[in-house]
Regions:
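Conserved GNAT acetyl-CoA-binding A-motif
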Residues: 103-114, 268-278
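A conserved beta-strand-loop-helix scaffold within acyl/acetyltransferase catalytic domains
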Residues: 2-51, 55-66, 112-250
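Conserved acyl-donor/pantetheine-binding loop and adjacent beta-alpha core of acyl/acetyltransferases
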Residues: 65-77
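Conserved alpha/beta cores of soluble small-molecule-handling proteins
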Residues: 99, 105, 134-136
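Aromatic (often tryptophan-rich) hydrophobic motifs at membrane interfaces
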Residues: 49, 57-60, 73, 79, ...
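Anion (oxyanion) recognition and catalysis
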Residues: 101, 166, 295
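Long, mid-chain structured domain cores
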Residues: 93-94, 101, 116
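Residue-level detector of anion-binding/catalytic polar loops
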Residues: 106, 171, 300
């Protein structure tokens, strides 16, 4: 039996320490990241203790009697340590289902942590989803990921863009000018989809100040004018492109091709470079043009899965 405690702000330090020592948590689960937008979500995260020792965490929010893990994060999932066994994970899911059912929830929607983010094998939760929860897969997004020690050659279309950008004199450098990049990103998203980025420029700068080594911006510039860039989220096993965008001049001159050529040259001391999803948020419909570009750099498929079960 586990003692189940609902997360409160007083648990912040203990929570963050557990995430840092876990086998599958990343800085996205750190409360200094999660809580930047806590006004948008009603938190209902759980902490699982055994004999007074913290064994597992579930980052979650509630909405309309549905429990989500977690709507404000790219991925959710149960956070555990290397010492946690399969039997214990099965027990955790049995007890968390009972807890949330007593609390009046009728459904759980669960975003699993993709395996590329695991520091040690961590798929005990996937087994529990079928054996304990009878969960069903309701959404599968596909991302493009490079195994950094076995990179494929770039395709000719990507090489052509790289040559074009080099001939134009485009320069690649790390930057803290989040406002300049956000303006390019916002214009692109607004023109294409009529939406704004998930993060505001102010939020990105706040998160950068809290995680200076994990959040990094690289820009492609011409005569000091930003033409495009990418914001990278760096975890122990993955460099992930949280945002990628270029203006019209940058697109015509191959700015992003040269940008990723230079970024992929760097020694990141991680296993994977992940370009992120190429599927729509609502329908999982594949954006073929987008995935063509990512696969041109050598990216291949990794899935981000979402499950659902009733209580």
């Amino acid at each position: 039996m586990f003692e189940i405690v609902r997360y409160a702000a007083s648990h912040k330090d203990e929570w963050n320490q557990f995430v840092a020592q876990s086998k599958n948590g990343t800085f996205l689960f750190d409360r200094n990241y999660m809580d930047y937008h806590n006004d948008r979500f009603e938190d209902h995260s759980l902490m699982f203790y055994k004999k007074g020792k913290l064994y597992a965490l579930l980052a979650a929010n509630e909405k309309d009697h549905i429990l989500y893990s977690h709507q404000g994060l790219t991925y959710g999932g149960l956070i555990t340590t290397v010492k946690t066994t399969t039997d214990e994970v099965l027990q955790v899911f049995h007890e968390l289902n009972a807890y949330y059912k007593r609390a009046g929830f009728h459904k759980i929607i669960y975003k699993a942590i993709p395996s590329i983010y695991h520091k040690w094998p961590s798929e005990e939760d996937l087994y529990a989803l079928t054996s304990i929860c009878q969960a069903r897969l309701i959404m599968r997004d596909i991302s493009s990921t490079i195994l950094l020690n076995k990179q494929f050659p770039f395709t000719e279309s990507r090489k052509s863009g790289m040559r074009k950008a080099s001939q134009a004199g485009i320069q690649i450098s790390e930057s803290d000018d989040f406002d300049a990049f956000w303006n390019i990103l916002q214009a692109n998203l607004h023109n294409k989809y009529g939406i704004n980025p998930v993060h505001t420029a102010a939020e990105l700068k706040l998160l950068k100040s809290r995680f200076p080594h994990q959040i990094r911006l690289f820009l492609a510039t011409l005569d000091d004018k930003p033409l495009g860039g990418t914001i990278l989220f760096i975890t122990p096993t993955v460099v992930h492109t949280q945002y990628i965008s270029a203006d019209e001049e940058g697109k015509q001159k191959g700015a992003l091709d040269l940008l990723f050529k230079e970024i992929l040259k760097k020694d990141w001391n991680v296993d994977y470079f992940d370009f992120g999803k190429s599927t729509s948020t609502e329908s999982c419909e594949l954006n073929r043009k987008l995935i063509f570009q990512k696969e041109g750099f050598g990216g291949r498929g990794i899935c981000y899965d979402t499950y659902e079960w009733t209580l």
